[in-house]
């Protein structure tokens, strides 16, 4: 009461002081990723990403046989960079395929390890640089991957994506389970199929795909559903035309444009929806890739990038052969 009287007389005491407003800080949009298209970008565009590492380079790689890539990793380790590499122990069911790379890297002081048996294959092809950049590849570091295949490389400097990739890497390095963080990074066996089904299900005008394999029934059904609602579906795979499986033939019968493309050989894995959104990553459209492997990719809402990749797929489709 005394306070109220004093406030009325002198304005010296406010029994109900104003509450300071808390500014609402909007969440910043993700940093736009850049997608390189191979073979046009050239091998050096990929190799130079390794050479830029100064503090750290953490890599998961299905197949590593290219001498230039192995030397670049060894050189970075020799310069004091924290180089860690996870290799699949038997890519293409060949237990010796990565052995030479493993031995050379170990001899150069790289922390190199065989991937965990938690996955059928560690088919991911990714690395982070200096805890600041994530590189998601469709290519293996091989002569073919760096020397003529149709491939894609996504360069992603978004801190959320980089942090998610390094969280997964740290767990995979020791074979531990982890909760996969959210964001644009999608992984198998956790989130690739849901991300792809949502991307395909959201298409209204067009879907353009490049894949080595297409056998997953849910993915095939999503593409057939897209055709049924009038979406233009086009896709390429490596061929030859005589190897077209039931899924490719079913899509062709439903009106999709299906082509076997060999110039350049198709090894990239991309899905482009309406030239506005895309997936780029390591996953083939098979149950093994989606359910059993370690795969990594990015789901991007970037119309300019989607249109760029979509134009590449369209060119490959135009140059392909009908099964």
Predicted features by range, described:
Residues 1-7:
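Sec-dependent N-terminal signal peptides
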């Amino acid at each position: 009461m005394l306070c109220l009287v004093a406030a009325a007389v002198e304005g010296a005491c406010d029994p109900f002081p104003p509450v300071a407003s808390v500014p609402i800080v909007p969440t910043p949009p993700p940093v736009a990723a850049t997608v390189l298209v191979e073979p046009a970008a050239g091998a050096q565009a990929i190799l130079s990403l390794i050479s830029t590492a100064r503090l750290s380079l953490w890599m998961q790689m299905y197949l590593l046989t290219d001498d230039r890539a192995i030397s670049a990793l060894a050189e970075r380790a020799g310069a004091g960079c924290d180089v860690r590499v996870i290799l699949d122990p038997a890519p293409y069911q060949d237990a010796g395929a990565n052995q030479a790379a493993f031995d050379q890297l170990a001899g150069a002081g790289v922390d190199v390890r065989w991937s965990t048996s938690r996955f059928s294959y560690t088919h991911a092809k990714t690395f982070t640089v200096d805890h600041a950049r994530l590189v998601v590849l469709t290519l293996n570091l091989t002569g073919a991957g760096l020397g003529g295949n149709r491939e894609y490389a996504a360069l992603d400097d978004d801190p959320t994506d980089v942090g998610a990739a390094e969280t997964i890497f740290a767990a995979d390095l020791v074979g531990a389970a982890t909760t996969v963080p959210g964001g644009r990074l999608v992984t198998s066996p956790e989130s690739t199929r849901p991300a792809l089904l949502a991307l395909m299900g959201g298409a209204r005008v067009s879907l353009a795909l490049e894949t080595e394999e297409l056998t997953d029934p849910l993915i095939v059904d999503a593409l057939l559903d897209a055709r049924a609602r009038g979406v233009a579906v086009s896709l390429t795979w490596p061929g030859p035309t005589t190897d077209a499986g039931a899924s490719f033939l079913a899509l062709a019968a439903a009106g999709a444009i299906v082509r076997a493309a060999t110039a350049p050989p198709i090894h990239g894995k991309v899905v482009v929806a309406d030239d506005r959104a895309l997936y780029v990553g390591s996953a083939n459209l098979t149950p093994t890739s989606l359910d059993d492997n370690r795969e990594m990719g990015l789901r991007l809402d970037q119309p300019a990038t989607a249109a760029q990749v979509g134009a590449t797929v369209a060119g490959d489709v135009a140059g392909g052969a009908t099964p």
